[in-house]
């Protein structure tokens, strides 16, 4: 069982729209439904299969998400350490700036990942981990929304406990070059007292059955308190959920246009002969030649491009929906009281609606980070240490940058449509 608030299918779709590539192609049919005529028994399934195969996903969503994420951290979030602690302790706190997770990733990178996660999935979690037993030098880790599938909140709306579900694949030890044959599933519980891990395995592609039992493989008690801190993003600022429908509709429109461009806009050779019946006696050999008479001509004809104008305009309207959805979100963010949760410096510097929208992603990350640091200070018996998080108060952005990002000067926006006559466009050799 998962939390009633957890929607794994929705999160999978949102992540596929962001990631593109194989993640998108594996569920592409969910985004390109069959037309009523394609469901009929009178129409071959080949038509839909060809349309699906030719459908290409232009990943506008990833550009938006990555631009937002980069803007959130352009002030270079970092930890500032005062002088009221020992040199050894100061070295530890400052080390988090360039190696926040113990794997070499700096704090600004983790903050950018956190911004990306709440923009796509609306929630994320900081987790404090200790790489060595009895160590007090904790490191930060980021948990994404799709793996945290169950949780309970306390009376203060904080995290009481969470369950994280992750999967590893296992290859045959005797055939390490072969594809993975087993899935190893881990369910990790985090609460105020302990960390417990349950494990189970199954064949790749198989479902669980009643005989499958998860076995407790790890249990560790600790005195840190709950090491997980939720990044509390406002659900009304869930960007990827807001632009999901425009992204899907844009994909469908582009897929339909590409299919017909590939299959309809083919130049067809033709002969314009004086005697309509003379074509019956024309030689058909690879080395043959046709001598045209007076007023006869040979050429190529193709459909008029004017017929595709509605499709191009529809694509432009879908891209406009992207832009307008985000514009509305920016204006909503500027009107919400959450803008006051930013520091005085940030409120003063962020005046434009787009800047305030980006600030609405910055403050939850900073807030969760400060709660994490406060717990670490208590655990290290340094409650009065002057440790501050800075760098979230400088964001400069406006709608013009977003407009350029979405529309750019691509084929659809910059191409000029050349209309032909009733008979289409043609080139001839008289």
Listing of model-derived features with the role each one plays in the protein:
Residues 1-137:
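Extended, helix-rich architectural segments
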Residues 207-344:
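Extended, charged amphipathic alpha-helical segments
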Residues 21, 71, 75, 99-108, ...:
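Short secondary-structure junctions and interdomain/linker hinges
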Residues 281-289, 296, 310, 317-430:
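C-terminal helix-loop subdomains that flank or include functional centers
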Residues 115-119, 175-178, 187-188, 258-261, ...:
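A general structural signal for short secondary-structure junctions and capping/turn motifs
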Residues 1-27, 271-274, 411-413, 417-430:
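Leucine-centric amphipathic alpha-helical interface motifs
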Residues 88, 92, 106-110, 242, ...:
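Short amphipathic alpha-helical segments
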Residues 125-232:
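Extended, regular secondary-structure scaffolds
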């Amino acid at each position: 069982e998962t939390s009633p608030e957890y929607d794994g299918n929705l999160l999978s779709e949102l992540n596929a729209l962001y990631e593109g590539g194989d993640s998108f192609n594996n569920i592409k049919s969910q985004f390109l439904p069959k037309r009523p005529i394609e469901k009929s028994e009178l129409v071959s399934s080949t038509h839909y299969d060809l349309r699906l195969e030719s459908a290409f996903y232009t990943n506008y969503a990833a550009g938006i998400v990555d631009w937002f994420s980069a803007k959130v951290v352009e002030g270079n979030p970092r930890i500032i350490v005062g002088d009221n602690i020992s040199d050894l302790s100061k070295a530890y706190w400052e080390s988090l700036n360039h190696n926040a997770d113990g794997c070499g990733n700096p704090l600004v990178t983790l903050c950018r990942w956190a911004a990306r996660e709440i923009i796509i999935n609306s929630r994320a979690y900081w987790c404090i981990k200790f790489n060595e037993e009895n160590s007090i030098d904790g490191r930060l880790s980021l948990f994404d929304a799709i793996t945290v599938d169950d949780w309970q909140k306390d009376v203060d709306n904080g995290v009481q406990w969470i369950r994280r579900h992750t999967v590893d694949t296992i290859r045959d030890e005797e055939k390490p070059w072969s594809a993975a044959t087993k899935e190893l599933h881990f369910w990790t519980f985090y609460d105020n007292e302990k960390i417990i891990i349950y494990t189970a395995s199954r064949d790749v592609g198989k479902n669980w059955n009643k005989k499958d039992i998860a076995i407790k493989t790890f249990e560790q008690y600790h005195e840190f308190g709950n090491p997980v801190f939720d990044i509390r993003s406002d659900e009304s600022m869930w960007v990827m959920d807001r632009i999901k429908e425009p992204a899907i509709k844009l994909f469908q429109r582009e897929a339909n246009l590409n299919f017909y461009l590939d299959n309809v806009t083919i130049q067809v050779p033709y002969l314009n002969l004086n005697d309509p019946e003379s074509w019956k006696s024309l030689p058909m050999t690879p080395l043959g030649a046709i001598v045209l008479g007076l007023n006869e001509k040979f050429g190529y004809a193709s459909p008029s491009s004017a017929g595709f104008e509605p499709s191009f305009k529809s694509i432009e309207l879908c891209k406009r929906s992207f832009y307008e959805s985000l514009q509305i979100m920016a204006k909503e963010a500027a009107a919400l009281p959450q803008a006051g949760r930013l520091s005085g410096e940030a409120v003063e510097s962020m005046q434009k609606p787009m800047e305030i929208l980006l600030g609405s992603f910055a403050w939850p990350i900073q807030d969760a980070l400060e709660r994490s640091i406060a717990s670490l200070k208590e655990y290290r018996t340094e409650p009065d240490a002057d440790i501050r998080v800075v760098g979230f108060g400088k964001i400069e952005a406006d709608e013009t940058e977003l407009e350029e990002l979405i529309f750019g000067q691509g084929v659809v926006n910059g191409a000029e449509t050349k209309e032909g006559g009733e008979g289409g466009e043609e080139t001839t050799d008289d």
